[in-house]
Amino acid sequence: MNKSVIFFIITFLMSGSALAEKIRFSTSATNPPFESFDDHNQLSGFDIDLAKALCKRMQAECTFTNQAFDSLIPALKFRKSDAVISSLDITPERSKQVTFSDPYYENSASVVAKKGLYSTFDDFRGKRIGVENGSTHQKFLQDKHPEIKTVAYDSYLSAFTDLKNGRTEGVFGDTVAVHEYLKTNPQLGTAIRKVTDTDYFGTGLGIAVNRDNPALILKINKALWEIKHDGTYNKIIDKWVPEQDIKN
């Protein structure tokens, strides 16, 4: 092959790679099965696979950064990331700060505690419930149930450790996430099931981007629609959130 032709092909391929959009995702890998570190210390989970599928559809180069949950939106606003995917509830309060994608998962919240002791929020009066710091679960308890002692943690893992050791009486979080811990903690059960107050838990989970980046949110929404219609989304759901895991 002519050397000039080879040079042209290489240049074309390199320019295509250089022109590929780069999207920096941030997440807080403390919330399996949505996001956590696997046995090889790699980010994995429903949100991670979803973001990768969206990037593939958008033909974008995507990277992921792990950070504390309560720093995700501030970091996005200061342009340290381009998008946040971390099981974020789409709420009116958050929507004042960022732009959300279309919902990608219908979410609810549940309280986990030792079996047989609690069944209503009133049962937890004067008791301690662990939440992730900066979460909608924290705000819900503080606003709606000040009679309950809200204890904030940097991760669900820390919250469940204290619950198992008797330092708290419950953990309040995403239904799917708290059910993940029940698999390996048979002494625990669901005390309060599937709270769906839309003022706090919104209309589902969404991907957050800067309010001044409408082009990116349009691309994400288009890619999300496409993977929901070509079967990719259902495969990710079946892998990470089997329906039988959240029925009870």
Where are these regions (language model features)?
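Short loop->beta-strand "edge-of-pocket" segments that line small-molecule binding or catalytic clefts
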Residues: 23-29, 121-135, 149
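Short helix-initiation/N-cap motifs at beta->coil->alpha
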Residues: 31, 48, 63-74, 116, ...
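Extended ligand-binding regions for polar small-molecule ligands
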Residues: 48-57, 117, 123, 127-128, ...
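Acidic, polar ligand-binding/catalytic clefts
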Residues: 52, 56, 61-123, 187-200
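Alpha-to-beta junction loops
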Residues: 59-61, 77-86, 128, 146, ...
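Ligand-binding clefts/hinges and TM-proximal coupling segments of bilobed small-molecule sensing domains
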Residues: 139-153, 189-195, 222-248
